[in-house]
């Protein structure tokens, strides 16, 4: 089944909702980076949220990057999305292992850490990208995005993100972001709070085979949910030999000349998709000449 995000509102327009199924996206990330279960969960949750946040942007050329540094053994988590919800991402230590919670659930916070920041960079085509840094509040990812929306955008939000992995494969992944609009009335707020209070976990809903449409109807029960559109999303890296070349330029003339002299070739990998690019001595000399 393809990955997609539903964009919806309540009948009165006072609540907006984004509900995603991202199993293929997260599985592709797991396959490319060979992540452990807990790293897959941390990266998968971040990719799902980043994809939805990408769809919140207005212009086609807008780009969004999320960087999570929690001080934990997973290292830095980086995810980036375009305005169509197409994402890519990676973690510093894809082989991280931590003890599960006593109930058997993955302890994502132990891998991510709880002392750190969430950084959100929005490139809206202006001279300077918008750059915001916010404290990490839990390390479980969903709560951290909830806090980000409350503080950065003054938008009360409910964020739920889930990834379920069996053996070496992602079984289910998805999530939702539901937000109150500034004109939301008490009645709407009370109903949404009532719904959220009795919600099963997103992982359980996905495990039960519930589609984004089903989840939307549960979250916005009694609020007449109205689907505005359905956006197909996925993992996409637009790297190329030409783009990756910037890494060779960045090391400087002296280091590049040393590589040419000692190795006569260079291999450069893309961090987002792990694709490797080989540069021959001739190509390296050409790059050096252009510097």
Swiss-Prot record:
HAMAP family, A to Z: HslO (MF_00117)
**Signal peptide (from-to):** none
Please give the positions of the paired cysteines in each disulfide bond: 237-239, 270-273
What phylogenetic lineage does the species belong to? Bacteria, Bacillati, Bacillota, Clostridia, Peptostreptococcales
Give the keywords, sorted: Chaperone, Cytoplasm, Disulfide bond, Redox-active center, Zinc
Q: Which family does it belong to?
A: Belongs to the HSP33 family.
Any one Gene Ontology MF annotation carried by this entry is: protein folding chaperone
Reported modifications of this chain: Under oxidizing conditions two disulfide bonds are formed involving the reactive cysteines. Under reducing conditions zinc is bound to the reactive cysteines and the protein is inactive.
Q: Name one Pfam family in it.
A: HSP33
**What highest taxon heads this organism's lineage?**
Bacteria
Q: What is this protein called?
A: 33 kDa chaperonin
Its BP terms in the Gene Ontology are: protein refolding
Q: What does this protein do?
A: Redox regulated molecular chaperone. Protects both thermally unfolding and oxidatively damaged proteins from irreversible aggregation. Plays an important role in the bacterial defense system toward oxidative stress.
Per the UniProt entry, what species is this protein from, by scientific name? Clostridioides difficile (strain 630) (Peptoclostridium difficile)
Q: Does the keyword Secreted apply?
A: no
* Any one GO cellular component localisation term in the record: cytoplasm
Where does this protein reside within or beyond the cell?
Cytoplasm
